[in-house]
């Protein structure tokens, strides 16, 4: 066997495999005999047609099958010997068949050769989110909203109230049109953006008042005017947090306000600790990609584009709305997909340079750590799951990523900056 490797680009190669008759002859004869047994030719009993006629009729098909098998047999062997790192499946692009020689040309993408620049001098800022008593109260109030009651109030509307009224669209003369009227429309003000014209106009108004509003938001096709005749202001009244309500809310998991409040704090702290780590990892990866703009194979970009597309689809309930342009979305996501591919290669290179690996002991330690967070499974059960064929690759990849992350963090300078948690509304 002879081989010739041609670099087409940083991420593409072509491999020419040249085989002698001794190397492909046995496979060729087997395929010829198989064809001879199965092909029915008029004038000959099945399996008794001459080889020359079989070659004439089925030769191209036999040659293609032999080339495919020989390529499959030798490509892996050559890739290992030459330390080729394929990023895509090899495709046959040319076959030259002669009685004494078979030439097969394969095209494939590769992981490019590169070195990660020294990053020990990089400095990053990590947000350290501070959880205050006010944050805990706000979070509990969000939970209590699901158990509150809407009561009518004879007061000016607050930005957290619900304003109910009839909505008329006004014509150019400023007159109402009953054909363009919406009865008893509910404006839940706190869920409208602060700059929304309806929120701004209705806040501070009382039942019985009439308000003219010009909707000139960018999302509107053209400016339009409305009149809202307010009939009612409703305000959400939260229930008092008691031990009994805690039992109801948590399904008996907690029995006292004190324990429930402590758990809310723990959940917030864990959430924002994870958020802080994710933000730092995003900063680290962005910097390393910027400093190491490694070319990404198209097959990897396509794979990540598909992943992003499927993620978006799941967020929309499993399917896109009618008329959604999948291809346009892929194009829009391509820069993001390319960064995912670049980060994968950079992190793999860091792992390779540090000779990182994941042992059974690593998996056991990870299972022990996860067991501390679980109330339903012990470490042995979790370990058994992690070592199963269905989960082992996933958990190995998770632990390896953690090791890579720790290596990067150990080499760079990280300063902490206290930050208030963002206020969320539901």
UniProtKB/Swiss-Prot annotation:
Could you name the domain of life of the organism this protein comes from?
Bacteria
The top EC class is isomerase
Listed transmembrane segments:
none
Q: Where is the signal peptide?
A: none
**Domain PPIase FKBP-type, residue spans:** 165-239
Q: Cite the EC number.
A: 5.2.1.8
Q: Determine if NAD is one of this entry's keywords.
A: no
Keywords in UniProt for this one? Cell cycle, Cell division, Chaperone, Cytoplasm, Isomerase, Rotamase
Quoted from the entry, the domain comment is: Consists of 3 domains; the N-terminus binds the ribosome, the middle domain has PPIase activity, while the C-terminus has intrinsic chaperone activity on its own.
- Give the similarity note: Belongs to the FKBP-type PPIase family. Tig subfamily.
Q: What does this protein do?
A: Involved in protein export. Acts as a chaperone by maintaining the newly synthesized protein in an open conformation. Functions as a peptidyl-prolyl cis-trans isomerase.
Protein name per Swiss-Prot or TrEMBL = Trigger factor
Gene name of the record: tig
